[in-house]
Amino acid sequence: RLSGDEAQAEVHSPPYVGGLHEAHCGVLHPAKLARGLARVVNRSGAEVFERSDVAAIEEVAGRIRITTPRGTVDADQVVLATNAWASETEWFRHKVVPLYTYIAMTEPLSAEQWDAMGWDSHCGVEDKRNYVHYYRRTLDGRILWGGSDGIIHHRGRIAPRHDRNGRILAHLTSTFHRTFPQ
């Protein structure tokens, strides 16, 4: 646990009155993780089928059969590594609830700006509200700021009109400036 003074020593931010440092946590770049996993899978002798629209998933003679528009794959085990559009398939529709989360990025910050924020580590930060804000430093000296009021779509439907949401972006920007008024 961090006292208010200890939290302020980590990140100079008026709203922070305490905190918790989780030593065994981390942040990751999802695309880099996916590419790394694919390399490991390929080296192990398994195959990765990307950009494969799945029409059906069924069990046939104790094995799993995946049917695509171009053919079928039978395997003892499969990993369904999907993206947001998994909820558009019938099999996933009632198993997945899409939740939009939004991010914004700052311009690269100067050393003076970083000093004013008192944030010199590369630890990710997350608040503990119902709709969390999360942020981290990027390798090129920006702040990736995300979270806020996500949009939840029941019945598994997503839509391009939700990819950019001006109201939520304005809210993200406002909460960023409240967190870092410097």
Where are the regions that the model predicts?
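Residue-level "edge-of-site" marker
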Residues: D5-E6, V54
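Flexible hinge/switch segments at interdomain interfaces of large molecular machines
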Residues: E6-P14
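Dinucleotide-binding Rossmann-like beta1-alpha1 core, especially the glycine-rich loop
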Residues: R1-S3
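Active-site substrate-recognition segment that forms the wall
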Residues: V54-A56, A61-G62, G71-E112, A116-Q182
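Helical element adjacent to the flavin cofactor pocket in flavoenzyme catalytic cores
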Residues: P14-D76
